[in-house]
């Protein structure tokens, strides 16, 4: 599996990074698919930026990218993290490892990703397009489905 998680050079989830990685994967004779880690280096190690990362991924999916096959998220019931300690001192539902999005934010992110996949599927079905191995970029998701509202990058 190939997982883009960002690194010393910064994030690698944007369209140009995904396209380059997919070209390298295809050039190596491997199936054209990868996952993106919305946390770690791609969020600048700030769990609150995961929705920004996933909004970019949703836009890529909604406009036709079929090589994105998965997204990794840091999620728990409550936002943030806490230091490990005696059970009586811990907040139930909050991470003791990496900082996480809360469940409400996670639900919104997953809803946006679901809408992006539906937009892509609806467009492909409406055009009766045979899905090629490396599809051309499609129209804007809002042009295809005006009801789709992706989270803003702010």
Per-range role (PLM):
Residues 42, 151-152:
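Serine/threonine-rich low-complexity intrinsically disordered regions
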Residues 129, 133-134, 142-143, 153:
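Ala/Thr-enriched low-complexity intrinsically disordered regions
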Residues 1-131:
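Expand to "…catalyze enediolate/carbanion chemistry for C-C bond making/breaking, isomerization
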């Amino acid at each position: 599996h190939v997982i883009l998680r960002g690194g010393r050079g910064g994030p690698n989830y944007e369209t140009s990074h995904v396209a380059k990685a997919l070209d390298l994967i295809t050039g190596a004779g491997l199936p054209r698919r990868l996952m993106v880690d919305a946390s770690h280096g791609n969020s600048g190690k700030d769990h609150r930026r995961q929705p920004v990362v996933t909004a970019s991924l949703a836009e890529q999916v909604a406009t036709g990218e079929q090589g994105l096959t998965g997204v990794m998220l840091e999620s728990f019931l409550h936002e943030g993290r806490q230091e490990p300690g005696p059970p009586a001192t811990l907040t139930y539902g909050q991470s003791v490892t990496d900082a996480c999005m809360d469940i409400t934010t996670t639900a919104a992110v997953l809803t946006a990703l679901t809408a992006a996949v539906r937009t892509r599927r609806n467009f492909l079905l409406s055009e009766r397009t045979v899905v090629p191995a490396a599809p051309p970029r499609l129209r804007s998701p809002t042009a295809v489905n005006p009801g789709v509202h992706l989270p803003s990058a702010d």
